[in-house]
Amino acid sequence: MRNALRLRYSLLPFLYTLFHRAHTAGETVARPLFLEFPTDPNTWAVDRQLLWGGGLLITPVLEAGQTKVSGYFPVGTWYSLAGDSTIHSKGQWVLLPAPLDTINVHVRAGHILPLQEPAFNTAQSRGKGMALVVALTPDGFARGDLFWDDGESWETFERGDYTEILFLASNVSTGTAGRGAPGQGVPVALGHLCLLG
């Protein structure tokens, strides 16, 4: 249970960014696989997995006592969020180990996820440094973004009191671009970079 809570708190910047996109652009936060992979008929009946955004695949255990779980991986490269395994899928089912203290979470190649060191609560988490998980494609490319405000005030986006950062990585270089109202952005400290691929 402790590891699940740590995972939840570490994913808050990514989830917060997804909710911002839902607010401003109508995107879905949690989505079925067929929404992201509509031409893959194998995804049409998958009802035991979900994506957060287009880049984070969650394969939970839904029955008590199970130590393994079967998950479908659409075509592409998928990295475990822990960085300890890689799945090069041609569109296939994979049997994953699922010990009690583990939630199977995989990052889709081509995505950059902002994370943060977990703490006792969300307010304390916000005081911790950010980390980036960079999941490179076989060609060496990834992109992601972060929307960050003070986490408490209303209408920070409308007032321009936020920081928005676009992260890009390629086999040649890495870079960021940011925006917010002049002099009002919320500071973001990057403390760690995890490169997958």
Residue ranges and their predicted role:
Residues 1-196:
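Catalytic core of carbohydrate-active enzymes
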